[in-house]
Amino acid sequence: MIRRPPRSTLSSSSAASDVYKRQVILRENSANIPSTANVLIEALPYIQKLANKIIVIKFGGNAMIDDRLKNNFARDVVLLKQVGLHPVIIHGGGPQITSYLEKMGIKSEFVDGMRVTDDKSIEMIEMVLGGSINKEIVNLITSHGGRAVGLSGKDGGLIRAKKMVGEGKNKNFDFQNTGMVSSIDPSVVNLLDATPFIPVIAPIGIGEDFKTYNINADIVAGKIAKILQAGKYVVLTNTTGIFDDNGNLIKSMNAEQVRQLVNKGIISSGMLPKVESALEAVSAGVQNVQIIDGTIDHAILLELFTDEGVGTMIRRT
């Protein structure tokens, strides 16, 4: 004999009250659904446009030392790969290098925004960049479900370098083991891009004499964006973007406008290598470069997948 389930002991008014409460909760929860759906719909055309494109990202600044921002960055990168983009990460490590050198009793020196790398510090810098920082980023990406491979410019002959030569008043300055990019061989990056793996590159180069050079990460990122003909080149910084002489954020500017601000001294110091790499990239065919605030949560996604974007866009014309 089939037994019927016992009838509810609740009164009809009590049951009706529970149903009403559930309906109220459902309505409250569904209030956020339209806005969430709108975000996804807004992102769709950008995802379609950038599908199968290489996205070069220069990871640097405070985003590299704040745990929340580091994890958000890793999640963003994994998402890019999942939706069909090909992120290539080039990271800096200035604050970590400076801190480590201070512990070793070595003072950091900068000229025109470039670190001067002496014989005492080059081995330590390579260890910090290619060791602890690079592997931490790889581990973060892995922890959020991605697959990453850490590289330095020495791997696969990726970055060939030569000694940096100063310009203007610093043309005779000896930058010692600070280098310039002489050539990029993207073979190893291209191999990884065709797989589920995300390349994470430390800006260490090797000279023709097999000497190790420390290279500014912004310069390396710009060169790699250029040689890979990246669909996008994104630079994470500690500022909202580029400002005019009145302190107003410039949302979009062309190469000539950037040069004017450099000549006026409005763009200076650590921002110089960033805009120089951006100018080289756009002049070589990269459609545009975004300089964005890496301290904003999910800044990469906001820049790539929303109508408004964040930061400053640099375009060729």
Where are these regions (language model features)?
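A residue-level signal for beta-strand positions that form part of recognition/binding surfaces
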Residues: 311
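Single conserved hydrophobic/aromatic residue that forms the stacking wall/gate
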Residues: 1-23
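Nucleotide/pyrophosphate-binding catalytic subdomain
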Residues: 17, 21-295, 301, 308, ...
